[in-house]
Every structure is written in structure tokens, then in C-alpha cells.
């Protein structure tokens, strides 16, 4: 989902992993940008194996790879974009992919799709927060209002213009006041005219996850504990 991330931060992540010897290719599975380059990356990563097979007389055997990752990061959308057809069910929530399946992407690559996986326990609360922010942890398991305040706290320090610019509202001294401004702009009111901050919080979180607040990254290679 490079379309949702801060491009400057993404560039630093690419450099970070390439320096560690990884093959890296940022993609936007929605419009297909970068998806075709993944095939070249796979061929480069498996170059030695391909040459070894050829010396043994094994020709045109497809590379078998596995796609793994945490829930709700676009694995199935990437597969469908790569294969140019709807091979897997997608949805902007964790747990859509239920089981493993082999998918023939092209004559050169077969991919094993797998359900999203999470650590059984988070040693660092920051990791859990980031996963909750992007929807990799089910929303039912967290207080969305409190989660939104923490997200706004992060925005205030690292992307201060994101929320005021997206909603055309004034900045505020506190996260609660900023959320009230969002509620006012979006018409989130309870009976009696009180602001519905829970509803406003859901708007902010959903808009963040869908890129409507701009391109934002929650972590940088040079500072792994931003929050």
C-alpha cells in the first residue's frame, strides 16, 4: 500500500532493507503501479536457483513463492492485481482470507496465499497501537475513541496539517478539541446538540486508513519508536 504511505519515508525503508540484502519493490495494488516489477524482483531473487535448474536440465519450472504478512495489509488485493483477475476475496478488514491456496500468477510464478498472521503477544504496546491504527486488529477489540485520540496525538507531532487540511478546520491545542472540530464539520451530533465524538473518531480512523488524510507513515527505519 505505498499509495497510503509517506513517499519520503518509503524511500528510506527501501534503502534500509536493500542495505540488508533484501529485494524490495513498493507497489500500489489498486492502480497496479509497481506490480509488474515484482515479477522481475522474483526472477532476480531466484536467479541462482533458475540457473541451477537449467544445468540439471529442468526448464520452465515455475518459481513457487509464499505471500505472508499481518492481516489487512492488501495481500489478496496484490495477488488479484498481479494475476490480473479476481483470484482471491478481498475486504478492508482483517480475517477475509480464511485458508491457504496455490494461485498460478503466470507461467513463471505460483504463489501460495495465506491468511494474515499476528504475534501471540505484543512485547511493545506501540506495535499493537500501530496495528490497531491500520485495522490489522479487529476494531471490536479496542476503544475507537481512545484509539483516535492517540492517532491524533501522533498526527499533531509528525503530520500537524493532515487533519486540519483534510477537514478544512482550525488546528486545536488538544486532541479532544481537534476531534470536536471534526465532529462539528462532519455534523456528528447527538440529540440535544452534544458532539458525538465516538462517531467523529470512527470518521477520522476510517479516513486515515483510506488515505483521505494524506500519505502518512507510522514508523521510520531510523526511529523505530515514533509513537
PLM features per residue range, with description:
Residues 14-16, 84, 127-131:
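Glycine-rich, phosphate-binding/catalytic loops in enzymes
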Residues 49-53, 80, 86-92, 158-163:
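Short, structured loop/turn "capping" segments at alpha-beta junctions
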Residues 3-69, 87, 187-189, 195:
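Canonical P-loop GTPase G-domain recognition
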Residues 65-84, 88, 114:
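Glycine-rich phosphate-binding P-loop
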Residues 23, 91-227:
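Helix-rich effector regions associated with P-loop NTPase G domains
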Residues 58-60, 82, 103-104:
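Solvent-exposed alpha-helices and their adjacent loops that cap or buttress functional pockets
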Residues 29, 79, 109-112:
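Conserved active-site beta-strand-loop modules that form the wall/rim of enzyme catalytic pockets
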Residues 11-15, 19, 36, 40, ...:
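Solvent-exposed alpha-helical segments within well-ordered globular domains of core cellular machineries
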